[in-house]
Amino acid sequence: MKVCVIGVGHMGRIHAEKLRDMAGVSLCGLVDADTNSLEQAKTKHTAPRFTDHKQVLSIAEAAVIATPTETHYAIARDCLDRGLHVFMEKPFTSTPEQARELIDLARTKQLILQVGHLERFSPAFREALATIKDPMFIEAQRISTFPNRSTDIDVIMDLMIHDIDLVLSVVKSNVTDVQAQGTPVVTDKIDVANARIEFGSGCVASLTASRASKKKERTFKVFQKDRYITLDLLKGKMTAAVREKNGAIHLEEYQAERIDPVMDELVDFVESIRQKRKPKVEGEHGLQALLLANLIKQATEKNLAGHKASGTL
């Protein structure tokens, strides 16, 4: 299968390396408007290089898009129009309207459209998934040092959206309320944020994301009747405290031997094309995460604006 990578910045280069090593896949082109990025990719890849994505559409069967978010819609539309299956890095698009249009286009063309919410492929999350039933409280911490990239978007769209997607994948209920706070720290966009999300089922999710820390942490905790699950997504570890009928508590532990969610999501993309089946993370999932992320962003900006206004009195 001939696959091209459009956008060879940090994530694009990672995707290119995984595709290069994947059986049955030919990396048929690397695309980036920045010639410096193409030159950096040249040291590891012999695939043809292009500065315009339209130059590769006639030779590729599928495209991995890892460009700035504001360019996602136009590039994906061109790819789908030409009959290419599309894997899109998160966040899906700049607006829900753009996402809906791409979903409809992919459906009409009978093409795979997958969004890169890679934590769905975390071995710890997959191990826990079968035991998560009717969660009542979820707490997620996604903390990172400043990456000096993805500064075109805020921390909600950059980091928190991963946990938003995980929450939506396990809570099968409508969102009833969103409260959020955040502030810029190292950029002019929100760099630290906390959101409280309430669902009709009674479940509450508290999500914290920061790209202004001295350490890295990615934990996801789920509380439900008779079970408390802790996931360390960086280490691929799951710990569950389980209450038995007699009141006794026992621990269940899982440690992944292999952690490579980027490879796993790309394998799912390629196999969904080959098998003509839906990928684990469809365009619709990307849209739902984007919609909730937008609500959190709006609540954060409203609170931040109110704080600034009150400070002038």
Task: Please name every model-derived segment.
Residues M1-K44, V167:
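N-terminal Rossmann-like dinucleotide-binding module
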Residues H15, H45-I103:
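Beta-loop-alpha module in the N-terminal Rossmann-like domain of NAD(P)-dependent dehydrogenases
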Residues A33, Q255-V267, V281:
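Active-site loop of classical SDR/Rossmann-like NAD(P)-dependent oxidoreductases
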Residues A62-I65, V270-L313:
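C-terminal helix-rich "cap/oligomerization" subdomain common to oxidoreductases
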Residues T93-S150:
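A contiguous active-site-proximal alpha/beta segment in oxidoreductase catalytic domains
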Residues G116-P123, F146-V175, H285-G286:
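Mid-domain beta-loop-alpha active-site segment that forms a flexible
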Residues I164-K237, M263-R277, T312:
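Contiguous beta-strand/loop segments that form the cofactor/metal-binding neighborhood of enzyme cores
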